[in-house]
Amino acid sequence: MATTRSAGGAATSVDTGPAAGNSGIRKLSTASVGGIAGGVAPSWQSCYYCTREHFKSISDFVNHLRNRHCTREGGSFVCRYGFNGVCASLPLDGVSDRDYDAHVAKYHVNQHTREMPPEWGVYSAAQNLPAVLNDPSRGKQSNLFTKKWGEHFVERSHVPPSPRLPDITHADFTVYLGSIGKRYRWHERRQQQLERDKPLENGAQGAPGPGTGGQTPTHLSSVPEIFLKSQLQLHHPATFKQVFPNYMQTSASSPESHQQTGRQLQEQLSHYLDMVEVKIAQQVSQKSAAFFHAMTTQHAILAEMEQAADQVRQLRAALAELHSHSVVDSFKVLRFAQRRQHYNLTLDKLRLMATVHKTQPMLQLLLGTQDYVAALDLIGTTQEILSAELLGIHCFKHLPMQLSEMEKLIDKMLTTEFERYAAADLNRPLTDALRETDSVCAEEDKLVAIVMGLLRKQNFSFVQAYQQEAIATIRAIIKQLLIEVLARSDSDQEISLTGHGEQALELTLPEWIALLQRSSQALVSILERIKTVVGIMQQTADAAVGAQDAVNLIDSEAFLSPGHHEQLKNQLQQLLQAVCHYCHERCANIVSPQSLERSSASEQELFQLSEIVDHFGETTRSICGVASVPLQLALKVQASRYAQRFHSERKQKLSLLLDQERWRQVDIPHEFQRIIERMAAGDYAKPEMGNLISNGAGNPVLLVEGKQPYTLVSASLMLIRMLYEYGCSAHRLPLLASYHARNVVDLLRCFNSRSCQLIIGAGAMRVAGLKTITSTNLALVSRALQLVLWLLPKLKEHFQAMSGYETIERDYQGHIKEIENKIHGIVSERLAAQLDAWEARPPIPSQTFRHISRHLVKLHEAIAGVLPEAQIHEIYGVVHRNFKDKLREQLLKLNVNNNGGPQHGVVTSELTFYMETLRTLKALPAEQLDNGILEEIWLY
C-alpha cells in the first residue's frame, strides 16, 4: 500500500498489491476528494481534450485514459494525456502496467482542477487590426505605417455618462440602512458572544480521559448519544452493551483485569459527568440573571394565581346560576316550539299521504273526461312527491311502479285513441266534408286533448301514424273511384284491382279524364281536411310551447321545449308535403302513358287535362307550400305525345302538298289574309279555319302589313295555316309552347329543304310532272321563302324560343340567294350565247340584239308579278353586268375600237336599242338607265 498526500492535504491510498497485478482498473481511495480546493470539481469528472466527455466515477475516467489517451509499445505503456498527445509528467518513457496505474492516480486523478489557459487567437488582441485599417469613418492617415501596434494604436475617445443612469448618493441608501441596522447590530452582539464562549471551550480540553494517554475534548459531541436520551433503560441488552462496551467479553481474563476495566469505565463515565456539569455551569452562568429574576418573581406569580383561581370559582358559580334560571327555561321553550313544528310537519305529511292516496281515483276521473294532460301532470307531480317528500314510506313502496305502469297505459291509450280518431275523421263521407262551414275537422276538442296528451308524453310518432292513415285513405278513395268508373263503363272486362290498379284498366279517354277530375276533387277535399287537422295540431303545439300569439288551449304551464316544438313543426310540414306528393303520384298514374297508351288525346281533351292538373297543383301548393312534380311530369309526357302527333300529321301533310305542288300562283282567300293579319298582331286567340279554295273568290296577292304584296302558291298558304295552328295551340296550351317551338323550326326546315330539292334540284319535274323549271316557279318559291322570313320574328316572339330560329333564317336567306343566282344565271347564259354569234355590222338592230331584248322581256314577264321591284332591280343589275362583261370580250375578239369608225357606230346603235328595252321594262333603277353604257363599254 503506497500512501501519498495531495496538495490540499487529502490522503490518497493506491492499492499496489499483487492482487491487482492483471486488473485493468486499480482501486483508488479518495477520502477527501470532495474538499479539494474549497469545493472545486475534481479533475476526473471531465476530460480536457475530449469534448462532451463526462464521468460519474474514477474508474470510468481511468478506463477512458487507458482507451483513448494511452499507447502500448511492446510491454510498456506510454501516457498521451496532454497537449498534442504528450503527457507533461511522463512525456517519453514507457512504464509497466502497475506503474502506469500509479502515474494516472497521482498526476491525473488526484490533481486539482485547473482551468486551461485559453489559446491565443485573432480575437485575443487588444485591437482588431482589419477593423482599424478598414474603418470607413476615417480617411487616409499619414502616420499609419509609423505607429507602433498596441492599445494606443487607435486614439481613445471620451464616452460621456449615460443620461439614462441617475447619480447615486449616500442618501439613496438611508432607508435601507435604517431597516437593516437593527438586525446588523443584533448580529454583531451574537458574534461577540460566540467569541467569548470559544476560550471557555478550548480551555476545558486538557482533562485526561480514562484509559487514554492523550487529551480528550470536553465538548458534548464527545459524549455518546445514549447518555443524552431522556430515558436510559439499562435492562435492554442493546443499551447495556453500548453503556458497557467490551465488559466481561472474555472468560479467561483475571479478576485484576476486570477491576482495571471497571475503574477505567468508571473514570470515563465520571469524565462524561464532569463535561455535562461544566456545560450546565456555563449555561447557568449565561442565564444567571434571568434565573434570579424568575426566582424573585415566583412569589408574585403564586399570589396572582390564587387570585385568578378565586375569580374562576366565582365565575363558575355565576354561570351555574345563569344556566339554571335562563338557559334551561329558554331551551324548554325552544324544545316545545320545535316539537310543535315537528307535529305540524307530521300532519302535513299525513295530509299529503291522504292526497297521494286519492291519486288513482282522480286519474280515473281525469281519463274519463279525456283530460290527458292533467292526468299526466298528476302522475308526474305524484312521482316527484314520492321521490322527494314521501321517500321511505312503507305503504307507498309499490305506488311509483303502479304510476309508471299507468303512465305507459295512458301513452298506449293516447296512441290508440289518435289512430281511431284519425281513421274515423279521414274516412268520413266526402259529402259531409263539403257541408262543413266552420271547420272541416270534426270533434276538435277531442283531437286537441289527444294531441296535447301525446305532446305531454313527447310522443311525436303520431305524426307518422297520421301520415300513414292519410295515405291509406287516399289509396282507398282512388280505388273506390276506379270501381265506380268501371261500374259505369260499357266494357265487359273483369274488375280486378291490385296494388295501384290504375295501370291495368282499359278505359276511354273521356273516362280517364272524368276519373282524374273526380279523383282530384276528392283528393282536394281530403287534403283540406288533413290541412285542418294539421293546423289544429300546430295550434296545440304552439299552446304547449307557450307561444305569445298561440291560442290558450291548456290550463297548465307550457311543457314543450322550443327544440321539440321546431321538430314537430317540421314534421307536420313534411306530412303535408308527403301527402300532397303521394296524391300527385296517384294522379300521375292515371295520366301516365301506360294508362292512356291506347288513347290519343285531342287538343280539347289535353286542355281539360291541363286545367285539372293546374287547378290540382295550385290547390296542393296552397296546402303544403311546395309544388309537386309527378303529375306535372305525367301531363308533360301527354303534351309531348300530343305535340309529336300534331307535328307528324302536319309535317306529313306538308310533304304531300309539296310533292303535288304545281308551283303556280293561286288567289289568296280572305281567311288567309285574316290569318296573316292576326299573326302580324300576335293574336292567336280566335283561329279561323276554312277550306282552302285555290280558284275561289279572293285577292290575287297576299298583303302583308297592308302594303307589301306576296304572290304565293298553295303549299305556302298551307304552311301559313299550319304555322297559325301551331301558334293557336301554344296560346291555348302554354304547356305545348316549348314542343311547338322546336316543331315549328323542324317544319320550316322541312319546307325549305324540300322546296329546294323540288325547284333548284328539279325534283318537281319528276314528282309533279313539270316539263321544266321556269323563272316564274323560282320566283314563287323565293317569294314564299321571303314570307317565311317575315314571319320568323313574330313566331320567335310568340313561342319565346331562343335557339334554332337564327339557323333557319340563315338557311332561308341562302336559299333565296341561290334562287336569284339561278334566275339571272339562266338569262345570262342565254345572252352570252347570243353575243357569241354577234358581229358589228348592219342591219341595226341586229337579230342578236332583238333576241336579247326578247329574253329580257320574257324574264320581266315571268318575275314582275311575283317579286318585289327591289329584287327585280337586283336580278337585272346582275344580268346587266354580265352582259357588259360578255360584250367587252366580244368587242376585243372582233377588234372593234372606240375610234369613231363604222363598227363603233354599229355598237353605239345596238347599245342604244338595248338600253331602250331596259327603259321600257324599268328593269333597273332610274339612275342606271342613262346612256352611260356607251362610254363604260369601252373601259377595259
From Swiss-Prot:
<dbReference type="GO" id="GO:0001675">
    <property type="term" value="P:acrosome assembly"/>
</dbReference>
<keyword id="KW-0744">Spermatogenesis</keyword>
<keyword id="KW-0813">Transport</keyword>
<keyword id="KW-0653">Protein transport</keyword>
<dbReference type="InterPro" id="IPR019515">
    <property type="entry name" value="VPS54_N"/>
</dbReference>
<dbReference type="GO" id="GO:0005829">
    <property type="term" value="C:cytosol"/>
</dbReference>
<feature type="region of interest" description="Disordered">
    <location>
        <begin position="192"/>
        <end position="218"/>
    </location>
</feature>
<feature type="modified residue" description="Phosphothreonine">
    <location>
        <position position="30"/>
    </location>
</feature>
<dbReference type="GO" id="GO:0007291">
    <property type="term" value="P:sperm individualization"/>
</dbReference>
<keyword id="KW-0221">Differentiation</keyword>
<keyword id="KW-0175">Coiled coil</keyword>
<keyword id="KW-0597">Phosphoprotein</keyword>
<dbReference type="GO" id="GO:0032456">
    <property type="term" value="P:endocytic recycling"/>
</dbReference>
<dbReference type="GO" id="GO:0000938">
    <property type="term" value="C:GARP complex"/>
</dbReference>
<feature type="coiled-coil region">
    <location>
        <begin position="299"/>
        <end position="325"/>
    </location>
</feature>
<dbReference type="InterPro" id="IPR039745">
    <property type="entry name" value="Vps54"/>
</dbReference>
<dbReference type="GO" id="GO:0000138">
    <property type="term" value="C:Golgi trans cisterna"/>
</dbReference>
<keyword id="KW-0217">Developmental protein</keyword>
<comment type="function">
    <text>May be involved in retrograde transport from early and late endosomes to late Golgi. Required during spermatogenesis for sperm individualization.</text>
</comment>
<dbReference type="GO" id="GO:0007290">
    <property type="term" value="P:spermatid nucleus elongation"/>
</dbReference>
<dbReference type="GO" id="GO:0005794">
    <property type="term" value="C:Golgi apparatus"/>
</dbReference>
<dbReference type="GO" id="GO:0015031">
    <property type="term" value="P:protein transport"/>
</dbReference>
<protein>
    <recommendedName>
        <fullName>Vacuolar protein sorting-associated protein 54</fullName>
    </recommendedName>
</protein>
<dbReference type="GO" id="GO:0006896">
    <property type="term" value="P:Golgi to vacuole transport"/>
</dbReference>
<dbReference type="InterPro" id="IPR012501">
    <property type="entry name" value="Vps54_C"/>
</dbReference>
<dbReference type="GO" id="GO:0019905">
    <property type="term" value="F:syntaxin binding"/>
</dbReference>
<dbReference type="Pfam" id="PF07928">
    <property type="entry name" value="Vps54"/>
</dbReference>
<keyword id="KW-0333">Golgi apparatus</keyword>
<dbReference type="GO" id="GO:0042147">
    <property type="term" value="P:retrograde transport, endosome to Golgi"/>
</dbReference>
<dbReference type="Pfam" id="PF10475">
    <property type="entry name" value="Vps54_N"/>
</dbReference>
<comment type="similarity">
    <text>Belongs to the VPS54 family.</text>
</comment>
